[in-house]
Protein backbone atom coordinates (compact mmCIF):
# COMPACT_ATOMS: atom_id res chain seq x y z
CA UNK A 1 0.00 0.00 0.00
CA UNK A 2 2.73 2.45 0.98
CA UNK A 3 4.80 1.50 -2.07
CA UNK A 4 1.81 2.25 -4.27
CA UNK A 5 1.49 5.66 -2.66
CA UNK A 6 5.12 6.46 -3.54
CA UNK A 7 5.86 7.04 0.13
CA UNK A 8 9.45 7.68 1.23
CA UNK A 9 10.92 4.67 3.10
CA UNK A 10 11.41 6.69 6.29
CA UNK A 11 7.81 7.90 6.22
CA UNK A 12 6.52 4.41 5.49
CA UNK A 13 8.46 3.00 8.43
CA UNK A 14 7.17 5.74 10.71
CA UNK A 15 3.55 5.14 9.68
CA UNK A 16 3.83 1.39 10.16
CA UNK A 17 5.50 1.63 13.56
CA UNK A 18 2.95 4.19 14.74
CA UNK A 19 0.05 2.01 13.62
CA UNK A 20 1.56 -1.04 15.31
CA UNK A 21 2.02 0.88 18.57
CA UNK A 22 -1.58 2.06 18.45
CA UNK A 23 -2.81 -1.47 17.77
CA UNK A 24 -0.76 -2.81 20.69
CA UNK A 25 -2.25 -0.10 22.90
CA UNK A 26 -5.78 -1.13 21.89
CA UNK A 27 -5.04 -4.83 22.38
CA UNK A 28 -3.48 -4.15 25.78
CA UNK A 29 -6.47 -2.14 26.98
CA UNK A 30 -8.74 -4.99 25.84
CA UNK A 31 -7.01 -7.23 28.39
CA UNK A 32 -8.41 -5.14 31.25
CA UNK A 33 -11.34 -6.93 32.89
CA UNK A 34 -13.97 -5.84 35.39
CA UNK A 35 -14.21 -9.23 37.08
CA UNK A 36 -13.07 -7.92 40.45
CA UNK A 37 -9.56 -9.39 40.19
CA UNK A 38 -6.29 -7.87 41.35
CA UNK A 39 -6.76 -4.09 41.10
CA UNK A 40 -3.03 -3.42 40.90
CA UNK A 41 -2.62 -5.86 38.03
CA UNK A 42 -5.44 -4.20 36.13
CA UNK A 43 -3.94 -0.76 36.74
CA UNK A 44 -0.60 -1.95 35.37
CA UNK A 45 -2.28 -3.24 32.22
CA UNK A 46 -3.99 0.13 31.73
CA UNK A 47 -0.66 1.92 32.21
CA UNK A 48 1.01 -0.38 29.69
CA UNK A 49 -1.66 0.45 27.13
CA UNK A 50 -1.27 4.15 27.85
CA UNK A 51 2.50 3.83 27.39
CA UNK A 52 2.13 2.38 23.90
CA UNK A 53 -0.44 5.04 23.04
CA UNK A 54 1.96 7.74 24.23
CA UNK A 55 4.81 6.30 22.18
CA UNK A 56 2.64 6.33 19.06
CA UNK A 57 1.68 9.95 19.64
CA UNK A 58 5.25 11.05 20.36
CA UNK A 59 6.56 9.35 17.21
CA UNK A 60 4.09 11.13 14.93
CA UNK A 61 4.10 14.47 16.78
CA UNK A 62 7.88 14.74 16.54
CA UNK A 63 7.71 14.40 12.77
CA UNK A 64 4.78 16.80 12.39
CA UNK A 65 2.37 14.08 11.24
CA UNK A 66 -0.67 15.83 12.69
CA UNK A 67 -2.94 14.63 9.89
CA UNK A 68 -2.06 11.00 10.59
CA UNK A 69 -2.57 11.53 14.32
CA UNK A 70 -6.04 12.83 13.53
CA UNK A 71 -6.75 9.91 11.19
CA UNK A 72 -5.71 7.32 13.76
CA UNK A 73 -7.70 9.13 16.46
CA UNK A 74 -10.78 8.79 14.24
CA UNK A 75 -10.01 5.10 13.77
CA UNK A 76 -9.72 4.55 17.53
CA UNK A 77 -13.02 6.37 18.05
CA UNK A 78 -14.72 4.15 15.46
CA UNK A 79 -13.22 1.00 16.99
CA UNK A 80 -14.29 1.92 20.51
CA UNK A 81 -17.80 2.83 19.38
CA UNK A 82 -18.23 -0.59 17.76
CA UNK A 83 -16.75 -2.38 20.78
CA UNK A 84 -19.28 -0.64 23.02
CA UNK A 85 -22.12 -1.64 20.68
CA UNK A 86 -21.02 -5.27 20.86
CA UNK A 87 -20.42 -5.20 24.61
CA UNK A 88 -23.85 -3.70 25.28
CA UNK A 89 -25.43 -6.02 22.70
CA UNK A 90 -27.01 -3.15 20.78
CA UNK A 91 -26.65 -4.85 17.40
CA UNK A 92 -29.96 -6.13 16.03
CA UNK A 93 -28.91 -7.70 12.72
CA UNK A 94 -26.13 -10.17 11.93
CA UNK A 95 -25.07 -8.03 8.96
CA UNK A 96 -24.53 -5.12 11.35
CA UNK A 97 -22.65 -7.40 13.72
CA UNK A 98 -20.21 -8.41 10.99
CA UNK A 99 -19.82 -4.78 9.89
CA UNK A 100 -18.91 -3.85 13.47
CA UNK A 101 -16.35 -6.66 13.61
CA UNK A 102 -14.88 -5.52 10.28
CA UNK A 103 -14.45 -1.99 11.61
CA UNK A 104 -12.82 -3.19 14.82
CA UNK A 105 -10.39 -5.37 12.91
CA UNK A 106 -9.42 -2.95 10.13
CA UNK A 107 -10.12 0.68 11.06
CA UNK A 108 -6.47 1.64 11.59
CA UNK A 109 -5.40 0.23 8.23
CA UNK A 110 -8.41 1.77 6.48
CA UNK A 111 -7.53 5.21 7.86
CA UNK A 112 -3.90 4.78 6.86
CA UNK A 113 -4.98 3.83 3.34
CA UNK A 114 -7.22 6.90 3.12
CA UNK A 115 -4.37 9.08 4.38
CA UNK A 116 -2.10 7.68 1.65
CA UNK A 117 -4.76 8.20 -1.03
CA UNK A 118 -5.03 4.45 -1.55
CA UNK A 119 -8.62 3.63 -0.49
CA UNK A 120 -8.61 0.41 -2.51
CA UNK A 121 -6.07 -0.95 -0.05
CA UNK A 122 -8.36 0.00 2.81
CA UNK A 123 -11.14 -2.04 1.23
CA UNK A 124 -8.70 -4.93 0.76
CA UNK A 125 -7.63 -4.73 4.43
CA UNK A 126 -11.26 -4.66 5.56
CA UNK A 127 -12.15 -7.80 3.57
CA UNK A 128 -8.96 -9.64 4.54
CA UNK A 129 -9.15 -8.93 8.27
CA UNK A 130 -12.89 -9.56 8.48
CA UNK A 131 -12.46 -12.89 6.68
CA UNK A 132 -9.62 -13.81 9.02
CA UNK A 133 -11.70 -13.05 12.12
CA UNK A 134 -14.75 -14.91 10.79
CA UNK A 135 -12.63 -17.96 9.99
CA UNK A 136 -11.12 -17.95 13.49
CA UNK A 137 -14.55 -17.64 15.12
CA UNK A 138 -16.00 -20.31 12.84
CA UNK A 139 -13.17 -22.70 13.71
CA UNK A 140 -13.63 -22.08 17.43
CA UNK A 141 -17.39 -22.67 17.15
CA UNK A 142 -16.93 -25.92 15.22
CA UNK A 143 -14.22 -27.27 17.52
CA UNK A 144 -15.46 -26.21 20.94
CA UNK A 145 -18.95 -24.80 20.46
CA UNK A 146 -17.72 -21.58 22.08
CA UNK A 147 -17.34 -18.33 20.16
CA UNK A 148 -18.16 -14.81 21.28
CA UNK A 149 -19.21 -13.90 17.75
CA UNK A 150 -21.45 -16.94 17.28
CA UNK A 151 -22.97 -16.34 20.70
CA UNK A 152 -24.08 -12.88 19.57
CA UNK A 153 -25.25 -14.27 16.23
CA UNK A 154 -27.40 -16.78 18.10
CA UNK A 155 -28.90 -14.08 20.32
CA UNK A 156 -29.88 -12.11 17.22
CA UNK A 157 -31.16 -15.00 15.10
CA UNK A 158 -32.71 -17.13 17.85
CA UNK A 159 -33.37 -14.81 20.82
CA UNK A 160 -35.65 -17.30 22.60
CA UNK A 161 -33.37 -20.32 22.27
CA UNK A 162 -31.58 -21.35 25.45
CA UNK A 163 -29.70 -24.14 23.68
CA UNK A 164 -29.12 -24.21 19.93
CA UNK A 165 -30.38 -27.16 17.92
CA UNK A 166 -28.16 -28.76 15.28
CA UNK A 167 -30.16 -27.08 12.53
CA UNK A 168 -29.82 -23.68 14.20
CA UNK A 169 -26.05 -24.20 14.46
CA UNK A 170 -25.91 -25.13 10.78
CA UNK A 171 -27.90 -22.01 9.95
CA UNK A 172 -25.36 -19.80 11.74
CA UNK A 173 -22.46 -21.57 10.05
CA UNK A 174 -24.04 -21.14 6.62
CA UNK A 175 -24.55 -17.44 7.28
CA UNK A 176 -20.95 -17.02 8.40
CA UNK A 177 -19.60 -18.96 5.43
CA UNK A 178 -21.60 -16.81 3.05
CA UNK A 179 -19.82 -13.75 4.41
CA UNK A 180 -16.46 -15.51 4.27
CA UNK A 181 -17.10 -16.30 0.61
CA UNK A 182 -18.04 -12.67 -0.01
CA UNK A 183 -14.79 -11.46 1.56
CA UNK A 184 -12.80 -13.97 -0.48
CA UNK A 185 -14.42 -12.82 -3.71
CA UNK A 186 -13.71 -9.18 -2.83
CA UNK A 187 -10.04 -9.99 -2.24
CA UNK A 188 -9.58 -11.80 -5.53
CA UNK A 189 -11.54 -9.13 -7.41
CA UNK A 190 -9.34 -6.33 -6.06
CA UNK A 191 -6.49 -7.04 -8.54
CA UNK A 192 -3.96 -5.26 -6.33
CA UNK A 193 -0.18 -5.76 -6.61
CA UNK A 194 0.19 -7.81 -3.43
CA UNK A 195 3.54 -9.38 -2.58
CA UNK A 196 4.15 -13.12 -2.50
CA UNK A 197 3.80 -13.50 1.26
CA UNK A 198 0.42 -11.76 1.31
CA UNK A 199 -0.77 -13.77 -1.69
CA UNK A 200 0.15 -16.96 0.14
CA UNK A 201 -1.61 -15.84 3.30
CA UNK A 202 -4.79 -14.95 1.43
CA UNK A 203 -4.70 -18.34 -0.29
CA UNK A 204 -4.18 -20.12 3.03
CA UNK A 205 -7.07 -18.29 4.64
CA UNK A 206 -9.39 -18.86 1.71
CA UNK A 207 -8.47 -22.51 1.31
CA UNK A 208 -7.14 -21.92 -2.19
CA UNK A 209 -5.03 -24.21 -4.33
CA UNK A 210 -1.79 -22.59 -3.17
CA UNK A 211 -2.47 -23.56 0.44
CA UNK A 212 -3.28 -27.14 -0.53
CA UNK A 213 -0.13 -27.37 -2.62
CA UNK A 214 1.98 -25.92 0.19
CA UNK A 215 0.55 -28.37 2.72
CA UNK A 216 1.16 -31.28 0.33
CA UNK A 217 4.80 -30.27 -0.13
CA UNK A 218 5.35 -29.88 3.61
CA UNK A 219 3.93 -33.32 4.31
CA UNK A 220 6.31 -34.78 1.74
Swiss-Prot record:
Keyword hit for Transit peptide: no
Entries under InterPro entries matching the protein: HEPPP_synth_su1 (IPR009920)
EC number: 2.5.1.30
One MF annotation (Gene Ontology) recorded for this entry: heptaprenyl diphosphate synthase activity
GO biological process, one term: isoprenoid biosynthetic process
Name of one Pfam family that matches: HEPPP_synt_1
Catalytic activity as recorded in UniProt: 4 isopentenyl diphosphate + (2E,6E)-farnesyl diphosphate = all-trans-heptaprenyl diphosphate + 4 diphosphate
Keywords of the record: Isoprene biosynthesis, Transferase
EC class (word): transferase
Stated role: Supplies heptaprenyl diphosphate, the precursor for the side chain of the isoprenoid quinone menaquinone-7 (MQ-7).
Subunit structure: Heterodimer of component I and II.
Protein name (record): Heptaprenyl diphosphate synthase component 1
Taxonomic path: Bacteria, Bacillati, Bacillota, Bacilli, Bacillales
Primary gene name: hepS
Amino acid sequence: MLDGASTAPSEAERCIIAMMLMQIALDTHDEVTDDGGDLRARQLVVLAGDLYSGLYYELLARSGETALIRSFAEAVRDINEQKVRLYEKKVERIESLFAAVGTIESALLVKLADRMAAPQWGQFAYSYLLMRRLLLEQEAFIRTGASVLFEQMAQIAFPRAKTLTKEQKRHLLRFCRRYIDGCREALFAAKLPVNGLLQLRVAELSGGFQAIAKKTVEEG
